[in-house]
């Protein structure tokens, strides 16, 4: 009883700090169920977070959205699919898009989220005016998402589109033309022709096209490639 009383006497700010050190969402969920004070402390700890990663966790639309909505000061959000059974859909992106933190996000990773479409991505991107780093590799997005990114994300510096096989030269040209701060783009596994890379470099000569082989193909004729 004395130990419980001592815990109960801990200031709310101290409890929130302790919970901010927790790396397990399961632990935070259990702590929220202890009492109203602990629930408030957990919520306060989430509000302080600037980074949030669900790597290794089995998440769904509701649980992901709930945590993002609590993280008022969030700057970096990683909801990549890193575990079998992790299922986040367009509905989850719709919910996340209404979170207070979204307009301040500078980094978002949706890598491998095969259940999302252009609809969800466009909805989320419509709120991200501060985005600098975006990873949408391993998804089935099309040029529709690229057009939305080009219109909204003028601060964008890096974008990953690994194996995004449905994007075309048209979408990439619009993206690079409008995102003038873009420094790096990963196009491994896409189906765009070498001529597209040449066009991208014409628009932005300093652009880093990854992997390096793509850049070499764009800059050198085939005979020189064999000599390298």
Swiss-Prot record:
PROSITE patterns: FBOX. Residues 4-51 form the F-box domain. It comes from the Eukaryota. Pfam families: F-box-like (PF12937), LRR_6 (PF13516). InterPro entries: F-box-like_dom_sf, F-box_dom, Leu-rich_rpt, Leu-rich_rpt_Cys-con_subtyp, LRR_dom_sf. This is F-box protein At5g67140. It comes from Arabidopsis thaliana (Mouse-ear cress).
């Amino acid at each position: 009883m004395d130990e419980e009383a001592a815990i109960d006497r801990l200031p709310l700010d101290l409890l929130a700090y302790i919970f901010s050190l927790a790396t397990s969402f399961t632990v935070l969920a259990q702590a929220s169920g202890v009492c109203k004070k602990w629930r408030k402390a957990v919520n306060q700890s989430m509000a302080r977070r600037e980074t949030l990663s669900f790597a290794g966790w089995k998440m769904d639309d509701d649980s992901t959205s709930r945590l993002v909505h609590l993280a008022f000061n969030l700057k970096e959000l990683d909801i990549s699919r890193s575990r079998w059974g992790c299922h986040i859909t367009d509905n989850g992106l719709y919910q996340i898009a209404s979170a207070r933190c979204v307009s301040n996000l500078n980094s978002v990773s949706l890598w491998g989220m095969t259940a999302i479409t252009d609809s969800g991505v466009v909805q989320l991107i419509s709120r991200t005016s501060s985005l600098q780093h975006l990873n949408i590799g391993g998804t089935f997005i099309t040029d529709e998402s690229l057009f939305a990114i080009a219109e909204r994300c003028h601060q964008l510096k890096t974008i990953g589109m690994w194996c995004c096989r449905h994007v075309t030269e048209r979408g990439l040209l619009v993206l690079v033309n409008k995102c003038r701060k873009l420094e790096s783009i990963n196009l491994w596994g896409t189906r765009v022709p070498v001529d597209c890379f040449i066009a991208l470099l014409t628009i932005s000569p300093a652009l880093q096209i990854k992997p390096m082989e793509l850049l070499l193909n764009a800059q050198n004729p085939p005979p020189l490639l064999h000599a390298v």
